[in-house]
Each structure stands twice: as C-alpha cells, then as structure tokens.
Amino acid sequence: MMESSTILQRRALFNEAGDIELHKRRMVGGNTTNLNDFNNMKYPWVSKWYRQAMNNFWIPEEINMSSDVQDYRNLSAIEKTAYDKILSFLIFLDSIQTANLPNIGQYITANEINLCLTIQAFQEAVHSQSYSYMLDTICSPEERNDILYQWKDDEHLLARNKFIGNLYNEFQDDKSVLALLKVAIANYVLEGIYFYSGFMFFYNLGRNNKMPGSVQEIRYINRDENTHLWLFRSIIQELQKEEPQVFTARNVRLFRDMIREGCEQEIKWGDYVIGDQIPGLNRHMVADYIRYLGNLRCENLGFEPLYEGHRVEPESMSWVSQYSNANLIKTDFFEAKSTAYAKSSAMVDDL
C-alpha cells in the first residue's frame, strides 16, 4: 500500500520481468508487461466500457450542417455570443485532454486501463475535429480564429481553464499518489460537471429548432463524455479499493472541495454566458441542474453530497437528459456504428 506522498514511477515500456498474474495487477505501483490480453482483464467493467466506447465511433463530417449556416446568422446577438464563447471553452478543454491523458497513462500500471485512456484520447481528438468542422461550416476564417482564442482574452474563460489546467500541470511536477488522484478528480469534474451548461445551451437551441447540426455534433460529444465520466469514476473507485489509506478524511474533503469548486465555476459561467436572456433557459435553471450534478457526482464516489436538497433531477431540466441519453441514439448492432445522424453529402478529407 502507498501513502499520499508516495512518488509514482513511470512504467517501463518493455518489462520482461513484469507480472502476468491477474491478482498482482494494480492501478498504480504495479509491475506490468504492457501486454494487452482481452481474455484476461482484472477489472470486469473494462470489457463493457471498451465495447461501448468502440461502438460509439462517429465521423463529424457525416453530420449535415447545411441548416446551421443560415441559422448562425439569424441567432440573436446574445445567442451568438453564447454560442461562440461556449464553443471556445469546449474546444480548449477537449484539446488539452489529448495531451493530458497520455501523461496520466504513463503512471497507470493496469494495461487494460491504458487501453481505455487511449480510446478516450482518440475520442477527444475527434471532438476537436468536430469543432473545427462546425467552425469551418458556419464562420469566416477571421471569425473562426476569434472563437478559437477567446479563452486567452476573456477573463471568465481563462479563469475556468486555469482551474483545470493548473491541476493538470501540478501532476507534471508532482508525481505523488495524491497528485494523481487530484488529476483524476479534475477529469471527473471536467467530464461530469464542467461541460454541462454548454451542453444545455446547445440542447436548448435544439428545442427551439435552431442549429440542428451543431446540436447533433454536441449530442455525440456528450455521449462520448458520458463514457469518459464512467471511466474516471471507475478508476477512482478502484483506487478507493486498492489504496484506501489515501482516502483520509482530509483528502476526501479536498476532493469534495474540488467538485464544489467545479460546480461553483460552472454556475458562475452559466450566469455569465447564459444569464436570463436566452429564451428557454435562465440562471436559476442552470444553477439548480449543476447543484444536482454536483451531488450526484459526489454520491457516485461515496462522498457526502455538497448541497442541501438537489437530490433529484430538476423537473424543468428533464429535457437535458433526454437529449444526452446515449440509449436514445440508435446503434446498428451488425455494423457497430451509430446510425442516428444524417449524413452530409460532402465529406472533407483534408485532415
């Protein structure tokens, strides 16, 4: 067993002395050969996760964005500003994920978990591809660049990115078990809380028959993020079993505070970018939903809830889960690919 301050060692790539017995496999501090054997996995949930993630494969350019070109020009000034800022936020954090996940994987010694992290990194790259396709379709090159880099000049955007980015950077400098857990919690916050006011904005556009292509892109991104949330929740739960001594009362308070901070930032962000001027949404709806998510995320890790009440999904926001529920997106079993989105006649091949 390790202590919070124990420094993790980067796993060797070739390790002829690595353990092959399943009972010796560990999330961290193990002695892996890095051999991927799909018939012998220590963690039973990995096989189901892997198949689900693989079945989720989608191609952004197959979603028809033709209606969005005109819709984007017809959005109100407030809706357009929200669209641009939310997209800038999503673009940056999905981009940094592709760099962060391999960094985490170097210190994970359960090879089947690294398979999952590799798939997640690939899906984050697809999300970046999706955002690029969305911008290329609806924007001029000048507008595109302005949206891409708004996070550098908008203090609200920058503060949000710094919270997650600094936690990721911390693990660059501190390879302790506690630092790894903090970066895992940061991922959990990112996938399970940080994106949701953005997602609900797009889904609200969909409810009002606006930007259907963008809504469908976001819906598929949301489905992927749900599997990523499942992955990091499971990683944290396995670490709770394997390294229970690290989950001291003090550290659990730290983790809960991180989740709380993520919630409060998401609520402030919703107040700033959505407020009370978007038809169909207001700041109270956003805040209630985020507090509900914060409690849900804590309870799923066995932590005490953060907010009094807020234990069930707000009735006024039930449409969010209807849009984001992966089970509502049809999958062709034989082709093992999604068939729920309309294919565009134009496929770009310039990546």
Swiss-Prot record:
Fe cation 2 binds at E124, E191, E225, H228. It comes from the Bacteria. Its cofactor is Fe cation. Keywords: Deoxyribonucleotide synthesis, Iron, Metal-binding, Oxidoreductase. One of its GO terms (molecular function) is ribonucleoside-diphosphate reductase activity, thioredoxin disulfide as acceptor. Its EC number is 1.17.4.1. Pfam families: Ribonuc_red_sm. Binds 2 iron ions per subunit. The active site is at Y131. Transmembrane segments: none annotated. One of its GO terms (biological process) is deoxyribonucleotide biosynthetic process. InterPro entries: Ferritin-like_SF, RNR-like, RNR_small, RNR_small_AS, RNR_small_fam. Fe cation 1 binds at D94, E124, H127. It catalyses: a 2'-deoxyribonucleoside 5'-diphosphate + [thioredoxin]-disulfide + H2O = a ribonucleoside 5'-diphosphate + [thioredoxin]-dithiol. CDD domains: RNRR2. Provides the precursors necessary for DNA synthesis. Catalyzes the biosynthesis of deoxyribonucleotides from the corresponding ribonucleotides. Tetramer of two alpha and two beta subunits. Belongs to the ribonucleoside diphosphate reductase small chain family. NCBIfam families: PRK09614.1-3 (NF007184). This is Ribonucleoside-diphosphate reductase subunit beta. It comes from Treponema pallidum (strain Nichols).
